[in-house]
Amino acid sequence: MKKYYATILYFLFCDVLYYYLAYNHRLWSITPTPPLTSEFVALIGEFIVFAGTILLFLGRYPPNQFFSIRWTGLWVILYTANEWVLLKTGTFVYEHGWTLVHSFIFNIFMFIFLRLHDQRPILTMILSLPIPFILIKLFSIPIR
């Protein structure tokens, strides 16, 4: 876990930044069933699901480029399929024009950036800087 600590922090920071910037104008949100709260589900997601994803995704990342593309594609499909199930069960909600297609594209970037951060963290942070501004502009997110 120590090897991927910085990448886990990068991921958590990006997710928390989304929740902060889009607090009153969320593009997607979780609507858990009682007795679970949104905060509890978010914490479980942050510290168990997302951290576990990074450990599995990067920990078993194949050295071969052909297999690495397939590995990344598998994770994009897993995350998108999971989101589709959550969407169909009403646990996940889209707002303000966000769709499953947007999530699919977002997942592609997310997994590419996770791998890139593992290899070149400074470059990844520089490349990540415009993403919130692009999303703010595309989806008319009011700045807090």
Residues covered by each model-derived region:
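Aromatic-rich, lipid-facing transmembrane alpha helices and their immediate juxtamembrane interface loops
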Residues: 1-144
